[in-house]
From Swiss-Prot:
UniProt EC number: 2.7.7.6
Protein name in UniProt: DNA-directed RNA polymerase subunit beta'
Subunit structure: The RNAP catalytic core consists of 2 alpha, 1 beta, 1 beta' and 1 omega subunit. When a sigma factor is associated with the core the holoenzyme is formed, which can initiate transcription.
Lineage, highest ranks first: Bacteria, Pseudomonadati, Acidobacteriota, Terriglobia, Bryobacterales
Reaction(s) this enzyme catalyzes, per UniProt: RNA(n) + a ribonucleoside 5'-triphosphate = RNA(n+1) + diphosphate
Residues that coordinate or bind Mg(2+): D459, D461, D463
């Protein structure tokens, strides 16, 4: 007896893993409830399903609940009876969603996935090529099944029709040849997987050719999968095909008597028709040709049913649209996985437009009464009955529909302490869904607290948000402890506050803390803050009046620190009845700050407010901070209103110096043009210089404009509103204001190059037609980019989530002794990110001691803010910390290696889904970045190329590996690449270091004293020069006019220049030799300089030179705008571990460079190590070689120009270096955009990319050659083999891109729902893979709790206290979510609150 539909629900939930494998014909028949033999669907008159048809009720179940088809048995009492008239079982109609049927095929058919999916599984097993196999299956050729004796044939050989006839005459009846899937099935039956596996392994041992070895390896992979999984090869050929339940391929009546049907029905009908016709033909003993043709048609119909379009022509429906086959229902965004299993719709939800709710508290949101009434209906009904307002649900319904006054009171009660979740699409990170306490509001719009807008990325120009209601008590508790907006004030991406005042609030606070000299009551002295406030009320002083105040307590004085906004790192000063210069507004602000907060004296801008929030969080915790945020919000709005700021056209002050600056620039441009005319500079240099001139002028004009606005003093006490907005950080940036009232500056062409004539006008003066036209490019490009990049960025996030979704904090300490070193990030001498900021929240791997030897941080201790500051103060250069990269946890990572959970500021807890958090933190700004170009309106902003380096502090110059020569002018010129100019103090400690680039002028001698701002080095940023190290005479070698060099006449200047070109003759190596004077002998004394393609020669043959003179210049490409366009694709390139085009070849060992000869158009270069080891590299001709002969290089240094390939870095320098490279490169892109992401997120992703090993020598392990396996698996297997005394496998570390890594995961469900669904499932089925459901995605798909957070095994035992309490008749409602100001609203720490009653919840 089959289990009834009731018990089935329970069966489903209770399993630990899921296995996929091939189904045998017996298995398919055992699933089936009957054979479908007729292609009919339903009767057109009665609309009842036809018997034995595709919708047959006898096979699939009744169409009405508890009712057989003919109506003889109705109602529940006949449950389980099978009707004697129509043969239908009396049961629920929903069994039509789960009962399968089957079709017995008259002739076997191959399964298209296994025959056609690459690599062809059937082909590999039989060792038949795909083309031959196809010919056999589609009845164009015969295959020998039994070669017989003495025929000279071999089993599995494919022969043509003629050859078969010929053989039939030669050896009648001796051999058997067959056509179609039958033949293939016979062959597959004969295969003995065990012996075949042995045979191939033997062959591989003896095989010499690499090609054949690979072929065997591929074949072995398929054979092994059958051997291990217990699947039988002949199951890849189908005798029976299952018919999926009719409700999953419904036939829906449309109005007008037509029907809309699922494509699957068409495909099944086709199979049934052809199958029935074939049966008849076989019965009639029709001619072979006809039967064969019918079999081929059947095979094609079955192929189309499983995967339409995989082989042959696509079957199309009535309107020429390809039919959706079974494979298509799984694939892609609209397929089963992504549409129905990963993205379900939920009830108890609603959506509406949002408006701002400035009077709400941070944990509240306004919910329209109408919505609340609908969403909380069941709760209201329950409460109405409970209170005795009605006795049945029906009455309750009526009360609610009539909107009886009592209903509103009850709604208030129900809503109290019942959190709701708000979500704004797109949900780019976890803060896109937060929980709030609802406050009922009139109208139809949801009200939102202004401080959570940043997290939701919401504005009020018509955005909509969705509301969801957590129903179960557990869900409510989780929502209110983990997701409440007041508990999420830190960003998981960087650990800084995310609920920071923006826009109006910033403006209000800026205005409030500004001082305006000359205001009423200026300079008065007050004894206390209270006196100040009284004086303000009396009208003696104004808000912006500067005053003196006598104060006792701590003061953070930003005024003395020149209004830096650095609240966190400014030392508070202790005042004891001392006088301080402040303003009335600042007194008001400080009056509203928390009790023990130091007095903050200074002008607060956006950054200052952000730091204030962080300071408060660090010092006083969450509770106080939330309270303060609401205070600041109210103050900000109040004073933004009181300030009455408004913009007029006169506020766009055009600086008086503008005209002069533009005139000067035009003169400079003329000078440059003249230089170009005289041939002193190349075309590229001219372009670069002009761009440079205009960039500088634009900068100058905008600086002048800002000063003019700041000092804009029309009425004696006027504050320029535009300046206030930009300066405070409320709205608008320097660039935008520059366009309003400075000059628009340089614009970019659609190709990305910069147009050299800038727009000198601004929007206030207005643009002329040409200027307007030039502007349109940028504006359009901005819009197009936005649309395209949003999609790209979303796809990147999806891949990141997929690769890291199963990284969960799994244990407290993995016990590793490995770690990574962290240093401050320094670019061109400036500290971009201090050591302090990089190590905070990580766990130390070794004791960190100061110079006296006192331990600052011990082993495995978390580095807090204070400790990090102490380490930096002690002058420690680098710190070794634990990192996700070196974590030894087999699954997930451990607490100690991950460190602090950035969203709480405490150590991370077990069960935290850090992989998903990492993916979201990296993906979310991606979308922000894509929008970046859009706002500025496409004005070209170039990073001005640096051309000199000045010292930041006083000290002494020290050369580190700089080799110099003196030029004829007597200047020192750096002649090597990796030299460094350092500035040291009198004790010889390094304070700054700068790279001395090749060809730079070194302006200070070694050891000379240096003043701060003194220029140390100068160089030409636009060209790369090749210089001579010796004085002497120039000899051209292989520089032949018209062959390897060309004299290019410049039309504009009439000057000619020699340019090296790529010559077709491979033997020639263009080079310049400089022979010192007096050297008579040929050869040896001459210095050789190779000339790369496109070099402009600056000397002529036979000319005399002095050391340090320029031989040739290579123009640099610098003038493309640096926009995130370089950004997003670059990030994707790094995450996908793609090889960059034209990668630089890097040295694999430390050693000395020797030049070799040129062969086959490639130049050989040797690196000789100290120990005599020699490596040779072939560099393409015409590239610029970075190293001179005899120069020393380190392993990993590039030998030529070009980007480095991450795979090379892994091979040469190892995993840690590669990881450092990846993290730094990706960070650089984000840093350019001013996006702050914590390193540990990037580390989490790169760990997933680097956990793979490629097996090179299998030893005695179970691995297959060239297989890519998880390194933990690799290690375990090797240990197992070693214990047994076998030979372990050898492998090399691999770097997989995120897509590849996602598809290599253990879980086939997760991989199939990501990409290439059919390929993944084919592979999994043949291997008989088992999915142990360890990641998040698999569990969501299977409809289980995710194994992270509270769903983790570790927390599953936690029960809600009070679940089995017997309810007293009148229990007062207990609060689950205590009031706003009580201590309980602290962070959720692992257990759950104890005192929860069930009263106020849904039972």
């Amino acid at each position: 007896m089959r289990s009834s539909p009731y018990d089935r629900a329970n069966l489903i939930a209770d399993f630990d893993s899921i296995r996929i494998s091939l189904a045998s014909p017996e298995k398919i028949r055992s699933w089936s409830h009957g054979e479908v033999t007729k292609p009919e669907t339903i009767n057109y008159r009665t609309f009842k399903p036809e018997r034995d048809g595709l919708f047959c009720a006898r096979i699939f179940g009744p169409t009405q609940d508890w009712e057989c088809l003919c109506g003889k048995y109705k109602r529940m009492k006949h449950r389980g009876v099978i009707c004697d008239k129509c043969g239908v079982e009396v049961t629920l109609a929903r069994v039509r969603r789960e009962r399968l049927g089957h079709i017995e095929l008259a002739s076997p058919c191959s399964h298209v996935w296994f025959f056609k999916g690459l690599p062809s599984r059937i082909g590999h097993l039989l060792d038949i090529t795909l083309r031959e196999l196809e010919r056999v299956l589609y009845f164009e050729a015969y295959v020998i099944v039994d070669p017989g004796d003495g025929t000279g044939l071999s089993s599995g050989e494919v022969i043509t029709d003629e050859r078969k006839r010929q053989l039939d005459q030669e050896f009648p009846g001796k051999f058997i040849a067959m056509m179609g899937a039958e033949g293939i099935k016979e062959l597959l039956k004969k295969i003995d997987v065990e012996s075949l596996s042995e045979e191939i392994r033997e062959k591989m041992k003896t095989e010499q050719s690499q090609q054949k070895k690979l072929k065997h390896a591929k074949r072995l992979r398929v054979v092994e999968s059958f051997r291990k999984s217990g699947n039988k090869p002949e199951w890849m050929i189908l005798d029976v095909i299952p018919v999926i339940p009719p409700e999953l391929r419904p036939l829906v009546p449309l109005d007008g008597g037509r029907f809309a049907t699922s494509d699957l029905n068409d495909l099944y009908r086709r199979v049934i028709n052809r199958n029935n016709r074939l049966k008849k033909l076989i019965e009639l003993h029709a001619p072979d040709v006809i039967v064969r043709n019918e079999k081929r048609m059947l095979q094609e119909a079955v192929d189309a049913l499983f995967d339409n379009g995989r082989r042959g022509r696509v079957l199309r429906g009535a309107n020429n649209r390809p039919l959706k086959s079974l494979s298509d229902t799984l694939k892609g965004k609209q397929g089963r996985f992504r549409q129905n299993l990963l993205g379900k719709r939920v009830d108890y939800s609603g959506r509406s437009v949002i408006v701002v709710g400035p009077d709400l508290k941070l944990h509240q949101c306004g919910l329209p009464k109408k919505m609340a009434l609908e969403l909380f209906k069941p709760f209201i009904y329950h409460r109405l009955e409970q209170r005795g307002h009605c006795t049945t649900i029906k009455q309750a319904k009526e009360l609610v529909e009539q909107q009886d006054p009592v209903v509103w009171d009850i709604l208030e009660e129900v809503i109290k302490d019942h959190p709701i979740m708000l979500n704004r699409a797109p949900t780019l990170h976890r803060l896109g869904i937060q929980a709030f306490e609802p406050v009922l509001v009139e109208g139809k719009a949801i009200k939102i607290h202004p401080l959570v807008c940043t997290a939701f990325n919401a504005d009020f120009d018509g955005d909509q948000m969705a509301v969801h209601i957590p129903l179960s008590p557990e869900a409510q508790i989780e929502a209110s402890t983990l997701m409440l907006s007041a508990n999420n004030i830190l960003s998981p991406a960087h650990g800084g506050p995310i609920t920071i005042p923006t826009q109006d609030m910033v403006l209000g606070c800026y205005y409030l803390t500004k001082s305006r000299p000359g205001a009423k009551g200026e300079g008065r002295t007050f004894a206390s803050t209270d006196d100040v406030l009284i004086a303000l009320e009396m009208g003696e002083v104004e808000t912006l009046t500067p005053i003196k105040l006598r104060y006792t307590g701590k003061v953070i004085d930003l005024v003395h620190a020149f209004d830096t906004q650095n609240i966190l790192h400014t030392e508070p000063i202790e005042f004891i009845k001392q006088y301080m210069d402040t303003t009335v507004g600042r007194v008001i602000l400080n009056d509203n700050l928390p009790q023990d907060m130091p007095y903050i004296n200074g002008l607060l801008k956006k950054k200052g407010l952000a730091q204030l929030v962080q300071y408060c969080y660090l010092k006083f915790g969450l509770h106080v901070t939330v309270h303060m945020l609401d205070e600041i919000k109210s103050l900000g709005f109040l004073y933004a209103t009181r300030a009455g700021i408004s913009i007029g056209i006169d506020d766009m002050v055009v600086p008086s110096e503008k005209a002069g600056l533009v005139r000067d620039a035009e003169k400079e441009v003329v000078l440059v043009e003249n230089q170009y005319q005289d041939g002193a500079i190349t075309h590229g240099e001219r372009y670069n210089k002009i761009i440079e001139i205009w960039s500088k002028v634009t900068e100058r004009v905008s600086d002048e404009m800002f000063t003019a606005m700041e000092e804009d003093d029309r009425t004696g006490r006027y504050l320029n509103p535009i300046y206030i907005m930009a300066d405070s950080g409320a709205r608008g940036s320097k660039q935008q204001i520059r366009q309003l009232s400075g000059m628009r500056g340089l614009m970019a062409k659609p190709s990305g190059e910069i147009i050299e004539t800038p727009i000198t006008a601004n929007f206030r003066e207005g643009l002329n037609v040409l200027q307007y036209f030039i502007s349109t490019h940028g504006a359009r490009k901005g819009l197009a980019d936005t649309a395209l990049k949003t999609a790209d960025s979303g796809y990147l996030t999806r891949r990141l989530v997929d690769v890291a979704q199963d990284v969960i904090i799994s244990e407290n300490d993995c016990g590793t002794t490995e770690g990574i070193y962290v240093e401050p990030i320094i670019e061109s001498g400036e500290i971009i990110e201090a050591l302090r900021d990089r190590i905070v929240g990580r766990v130390a791997l070794e004791d960190q001691k100061d110079y006296e030897g006192n331990v600052i941080v011990g082993v495995n201790q978390e580095i807090t803010e204070d400790l990090a500051a102490a380490i930096q103060a002690a002058g420690i250069e680098r710190v070794k910390i634990r990192s996700v990269l070196t974590c030894e946890s087999k699954r997930g990572v451990c607490v100690a290696c991950y460190g602090r959970n950035l969203a709480t500021g405490r150590l991370v807890e077990r069960g935290e889904a850090v992989g998903v958090i990492a993916a979201q933190s990296i993906g979310e700004p991606g979308t922000q970045l894509t929008m970046r170009t859009f706002h500025i309106g496409g004005t070209a902003t170039r990073i001005n190329e640096q051309s000199k380096q000045d010292a930041k502090s006083d000290g002494f110059a020290r050369y580190i590996g700089i080799q110099t020569v003196r030029s004829k002018v007597g200047e020192l010129i750096a002649m090597n690449r990796n030299g460094i100019m350092a500035v040291v103090d009198d004790k010889g400690r390094e304070k700054e270091r700068y790279p001395a680039v090749y060809g730079a002028r070194v302006l200070v001698e070694d050891g000379a004293p240096v003043k701060s701002n003194q220029v140390l080095l100068e160089w030409d940023p636009y060209t790369f020069s090749i210089l001579t190290e010796v004085s002497g005479v120039v000899h051209f070698k292989d520089l032949i006019d018209g062959l390897t060099m060309q004299e290019r006449l410049d039309e504009v200047t009439g000057m000619s220049q020699l340019v090296v070109i790529d010559s077709p003759d491979e033997k020639r190596q263009p080079m310049i030799q400089v022979r010192p004077e007096g050297a008579t002998g040929r050869g040896s004394e001459a210095k050789k300089y190779l000339m790369p393609t496109h070099a402009h020669l600056m000397v002529r043959d036979g000319e005399e030179l002095h050391a340090g003179d320029v031989l040739a210049k290579i123009p640099r490409e610098t003038t493309k705008t640096k926009d995130i366009t370089g950004g997003l694709p670059r990030v994707v390139e790094l995450f996908e571990a793609r090889k960059p085009r034209e990668t630089a070849i890097i040295a694999e060992i430390n050693g000395t460079v020797k030049y070799g000869e040129v062969t086959k158009g490639q130049r050989k270069i040797y690196v000789e190590g100290e120990d005599g080891e020699k490596r040779e590299y072939a560099l393409p001709r015409g590239v610029h070689i970075n190293v001179q002969e005899g120069e020393k290089v380190k392993a990993g240094e590039p030998l030529m120009d070009g980007p480095r390939d991450p795979h090379d870095i892994l091979a040469v320098l190892g995993e840690k270096e590669l990881q450092k490279y990846l993290v730094n490169e990706i960070q650089e892109v984000y840093r350019l955009q001013g996006v702050n992401i914590n390193d540990k997120h990037l580390e989490t992703i790169s760990r997933q990319m680097m956990r793979w090993v490629k097996v090179e020598d299998i030893g005695d392990t179970e691995f297959l050659p060239e297989e890519i396996v998880d390194k933990f698996k690799f290690r375990t297997e090797n240990n197992k083999v070693l214990e047994a005394g076998g030979r372990p496998a050898q492998g090399k570390a691999m770097l997989l891109g995120i897509t590849k890594a996602s598809l290599s995961t253990d879980s086939f469900i997760s991989a199939a729902s990501f990409q290439e669904t059919t390929r993944v499932l084919t592979e999994a089925a043949i291997n008989g893979k088992v999915d142990y459901l360890r990641g998040l995605k698999e569990n969501v798909i299977m409809g289980r709790l995710v194994p992270a957070g509270t769903g983790m095994e570790y927390y599953r035992q936690v029960k809600i206290a009070g679940e089995d309490v017997v309810e007293e008749p009148v229990a007062e409602p207990l609060d689950i979510i205590p009031g706003y100001d009580e201590e309980t609203r602290l962070q959720y720490a692992g257990g759950l609150p104890e005192d929860t009653g069930e009263e106020s919840l849904a039972e």
